[in-house]
């Protein structure tokens, strides 16, 4: 079965750049014919273009297991943790931008506190330490490479 890694986020906002940074770390380091990486610092995948990206993927790659990577907001005590769930991910939920869910495995790096308010969450994502993003992206990238033996 093909494994499709979708790294969600935008390089325009530090707190939302975790996915693209992981994609950047993985993109040229995966040398297996059945593993595909989508989303990096140059080609962002967000709630705005996810439908088009999925349509393209589904036309090109059959029988896929989807692994999604994104930054997330949560309780203050979870900041810096990586949450792995064998379930779908909802894209753009911190900013109430989407209720579209998909995927088989979700990897979320907790980058800030969920304030339960769209404007406060937007500000939270824009005030994340780049060091936290770098550390989480390194941790996630290394684990993926180890698990997939690439």
Give residue spans per PLM region.
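N-terminal catalytic or cofactor-binding beta/alpha core of small enzyme domains
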Residues: 1-66, 71-150
């Amino acid at each position: 079965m093909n494994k499709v890694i979708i790294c969600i986020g935008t390089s325009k906002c530090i707190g939302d750049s975790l996915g693209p940074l992981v994609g950047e770390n993985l993109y040229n380091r995966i040398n297996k014919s059945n593993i595909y990486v989508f989303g990096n610092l140059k080609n962002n995948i967000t709630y705005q273009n996810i439908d088009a990206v999925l349509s393209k993927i589904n036309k090109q790659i059959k029988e896929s297991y989807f692994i999604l990577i994104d930054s997330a907001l949560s309780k203050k005590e979870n900041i810096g943790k990586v949450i792995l769930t064998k379930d779908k991910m909802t894209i753009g939920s911190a900013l109430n931008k989407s209720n579209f869910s998909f995927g088989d495995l979700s990897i979320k790096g907790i980058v800030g506190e969920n304030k339960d308010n769209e404007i406060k969450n937007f500000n939270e994502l824009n005030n994340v330490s780049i060091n936290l993003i770098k550390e989480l992206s390194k941790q996630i990238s290394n684990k993926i490479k180890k698990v997939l033996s690439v």
